[in-house]
């Protein structure tokens, strides 16, 4: 099997596996969860593994982990696991990205520290670090603003299946335009602080369920003329502070409200499952984008959104 065919097979298989969970609900998964303190839903180990798989395989692919974590459990009759559970198992994804990019991160931090000591403000690692910091500010600002203005965001209409479907369709079209018009001239060595800020603004759009943090940043990177792999790699690095902060904030809230008996173990299993599959997704996507376009994700998002709207219209899914 050629390298192209192997890469294509891995990516399509991963996405198809995630989709199959939605399309083929099994009796063994049919039990509805009960609410647990902090907005987390009580679940069994098997459910936690499946949701960890969904989180891991969709967090770093440009198809929205939030959308799939909302749709999959609802389609399987489990109910929405909630914002808190989603944010907590993202800690597994952040562990995976830290593991994968540990060498890059240590080099960037050491380089930036050395540049500050030498007052070499033109240093590449320092500028890259500042780009990541600047890019993190928008999502932190708007995230705190939403938490302040919409305290019941977990149950707001913007988290409805219909809204998620529309967001998925819109982002598929935007990614398609970026894929078509992007010049893809600049590699990782030519990133600027301005790139960090602009991709950070795009990252803030991921606060809207269904948009996809990876999808919005990858799309903006293509519009800015970055190579596909460069846009994806920087998107991963940019996401480290945002995903970590979101997970820690929700983790604090969950522990403050208490976790019901039996809920801790599934959470831990979900985090581990998410970490394993996130690592696989990161490696697979970077390898894939070295030689291939994003059209497989564009079409997937479009079909995913249309399928949800169709299921809602047919009464198969409730627009909740």
UniProtKB/Swiss-Prot annotation:
Membrane-topology descriptor: Multi-pass membrane protein
Pfam families the UniProt entry points to: BacA
Catalytic activity: di-trans,octa-cis-undecaprenyl diphosphate + H2O = di-trans,octa-cis-undecaprenyl phosphate + phosphate + H(+)
Record flagged with keyword Membrane: yes
Subcellular location per the Swiss-Prot or TrEMBL entry: Cell inner membrane
Matches recorded under InterPro entries: UppP (IPR003824)
Entry's Gene Ontology cellular component terms: plasma membrane
Top-level class of the enzyme under EC nomenclature: hydrolase
This enzyme's EC code(s): 3.6.1.27
First-listed, main subcellular location of the protein, grouped into a coarse class: membrane
Gene Ontology molecular function, alphabetical: undecaprenyl-diphosphatase activity
Chain segments annotated as coiled-coil in the UniProt record: none
Record keywords, A-Z: Antibiotic resistance, Cell inner membrane, Cell membrane, Cell shape, Cell wall biogenesis/degradation, Hydrolase, Membrane, Peptidoglycan synthesis, Transmembrane, Transmembrane helix
One GO term (biological process): peptidoglycan biosynthetic process
Membrane-spanning parts: 9-29, 82-102, 130-150, 161-181, 191-211, 236-256, 265-285, 296-316
Note: Bacitracin is thought to be involved in the inhibition of peptidoglycan synthesis by sequestering undecaprenyl diphosphate, thereby reducing the pool of lipid carrier available.
Family statement: Belongs to the UppP family.
Biological role: Catalyzes the dephosphorylation of undecaprenyl diphosphate (UPP). Confers resistance to bacitracin.
Protein name: Undecaprenyl-diphosphatase
Lineage: Bacteria, Bacillati, Cyanobacteriota, Cyanophyceae, Nostocales
Gene that this polypeptide is encoded by: uppP
